[in-house]
Amino acid sequence: MTTNSIRRIVVTAGEPAGIGPDLVLALSKEDWAHQIVVCADKNMLLERAKMLGIDVQLFDYNPEEAPKAQKAGTLIVDHVEIAENAIAGQLNEANGHYVLKTLERAALGCMNDEFDAIVTGPVHKGVINRAGVAFSGHTEFFAEKSNTPLVVMMLATEGLRVALVTTHIPLAYVSKAVTEERLEKIIDILHKDLVEKFAIAEPNIYVCGLNPHAGEDGCLGREEIETITPTLEKIQKEKGIKLIGPLPADTIFNEKYLNDADAVLGMYHDQVLPVLKYKGFGRSVNITLGLPFIRTSVDHGTALELAGTGQADTGSFRTALTHAIELVEKKQ
């Protein structure tokens, strides 16, 4: 961790054929109060900047120098060599390992207190897997690299935070994955980070049921009766965490609940993320809770068709960086 008031945020550019490099280069158009270090191939960034017509000076990253506020028209690059020349819009499996190297470098830097937070650009899971590496997402990757047994995936936009009990698993596996043990661990992490990272003294956590109508008293499924409700009651009794639910997912996003909710906990990926993205797509941020470092990310994919065109929406990426900075500053 940097010791002065100016912090060092590492940014990974993600899939080189996608809009990640475009988003990173867009950061150079304005001043930033903290130092932004881009983990990517320097030549790839220069080529994309030329394609986009962005006038930017790239400086080599020196970890021995004290961090300085970022000036418009500049980027500091921690160079990671790409395997093959990246062509905007054209995936290349040869560069799958390159993407992972940038993520590994960023994670190692955070764990060594060299960086204060990671902001990740979008990656293409298919390319990485076809390169011979089993990869299900940033969240799981950073958990493995930091030896964190369990992390929580949260997405946030203005007026709404959602977190997940299960993440990137097939829907058919969700019911068996929603266990008392997992629920308790997920809620512990969610509550802890809401208190410590978001500075919410006594957070209200609203919890979705798994089944339609939260099981309708067992008529539409018994997971609520047998697992979810007893676990929530146990946690409230033993730990005093404020939990409301399980509530039907089709009504939990009503304003009368959201006005009081500091976070909504969903049982699976597509139960809560469609609502979040409908409410704030392009203005949302992905936050990994439970890691020993701060990590935020965009809420969208690689958008290959927009790479190099100058048409990519920078809203989510800028939100992710701004949110990371806010969380870092709260730690000061």
Swiss-Prot record:
Listed pathway(s): Cofactor biosynthesis; pyridoxine 5'-phosphate biosynthesis; pyridoxine 5'-phosphate from D-erythrose 4-phosphate: step 4/5
Ligand binding (substrate): 138-139, 277, 286, 295
Leader sequence segment: none
GO cellular component: cytoplasm
Catalytic activity, as annotated: 4-(phosphooxy)-L-threonine + NAD(+) = 3-amino-2-oxopropyl phosphate + CO2 + NADH
Cofactor(s) needed: Zn(2+); Mg(2+); Co(2+)
Protein's cellular compartments: Cytoplasm
Keyword Protein biosynthesis: no
Listed GO MF terms: 4-hydroxythreonine-4-phosphate dehydrogenase activity; cobalt ion binding; magnesium ion binding; NAD binding; zinc ion binding
The keyword Zinc appears for this protein: yes
EC number: 1.1.1.262
Residue sites binding a divalent metal cation per the record: 168, 213, 269
Xref: InterPro entries: PdxA, PdxA_fam
Cofactor note: Binds 1 divalent metal cation per subunit. Can use ions such as Zn(2+), Mg(2+) or Co(2+).
GO biological process: pyridoxal phosphate biosynthetic process; pyridoxine biosynthetic process
Enzyme class, spelled out: oxidoreductase
UniProtKB keywords: Cobalt, Cytoplasm, Magnesium, Metal-binding, NAD, NADP, Oxidoreductase, Pyridoxine biosynthesis, Zinc
Remarks, miscellaneous: The active site is located at the dimer interface.
Annotated NCBIfam families: pdxA
Function: Catalyzes the NAD(P)-dependent oxidation of 4-(phosphooxy)-L-threonine (HTP) into 2-amino-3-oxo-4-(phosphooxy)butyric acid which spontaneously decarboxylates to form 3-amino-2-oxopropyl phosphate (AHAP).
Family in the record: Belongs to the PdxA family.
Subunit structure: Homodimer.
Matches recorded under HAMAP family: PdxA
The protein, known as: 4-hydroxythreonine-4-phosphate dehydrogenase
Species, as recorded: Vibrio parahaemolyticus serotype O3:K6 (strain RIMD 2210633)
The encoding gene: pdxA
